[in-house]
Amino acid sequence: MMKSIKDRSFRPVDVAVAPDGSIFISDWYDPIIGGLAQRDISRGRLYRIAPKGSRYGQPKLDYGSAKECVNALKNPNYCVRYKAWNALHKMGSKAEKELMKMFLSKNLRHRARALWLMGKIEGRSAHFVDMASKDQDPNIRILALRLARQTGTPLIKVIEKMTSDPSAKVRRECAISLTHVRGDKKASLWASLAINHDAGDRWSLEALGIAAENDWDSCLSSWLKLVGDDWDTDKGKDIIWRSRAKESSLLIAKILKDPKVPEKDRPRYFRALDFQDAAQREEALIKILE
């Protein structure tokens, strides 16, 4: 990170990585702080950050073969990567062998770039989504879900295999993916994800909330069938607090009437009633007063 203590005119406004790996920073460099003199129109500075003694040079880049394009796809400069990506995409299945070598490397960013391209090869999307969904790295498994959404690969089959994934962030991505799903299977998949929610994980909770939008009644009902009387746990209360189903208000009322609920937690449940349907909220408030 660059900053200047003495030079008050130093105002870095943009940064870019050059094809040789050096970093360029553009400095607005307004010599007058405040006022309308507009002296910045004809002023400015560029800084290059690189190892000591390193001279700027334009690396030799070629996009004629899959091997050369894959090498360019690893470049830190996004313009180089853009040209490489488009060239590889046009090659289609002819580039698959070289892309697979890149995918099998240890560099996570390189693996992700290769997977995005392989997933766009005509007729191969489902294969690479399936392959990525079984990967040891949770970031690649997340990418499998995003690739499925972008390529139109049936999401239900992908999510079904991943609802019990050991990684919370993969399960969150499953929930986000469910937002795009309609039909009978959605509620049961949502319930499976909700069962695996970790109490206190707000990111997980919000992902589940986004997934259930417009389908709260069926989603919550399916979850309640799975948990039965065991809904009254810390993670179960999380789900109820975030839910917007017809049953939610009365369940919140049960939580509020429970003497074991700490006093410090009660305001959040009362606040949760504000997000429920008015008629059901009134019914719940009457229950609380009884």
Where are these regions (language model features)?
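Blade-edge beta-strand/turn elements of extracellular beta-propeller
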Residues: 1-7
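Active-site rim elements
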Residues: 2, 32-34, 194
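Residue-level detector of Asp-centered blade-edge/turn motifs that repeat once per structural unit
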Residues: 17-19
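Long, ordered, helix-rich scaffold segments
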Residues: 26, 42, 49-290
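Short, conserved, GDST-rich strand-edge loop motifs in beta-rich repeat architectures
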Residues: 28-41
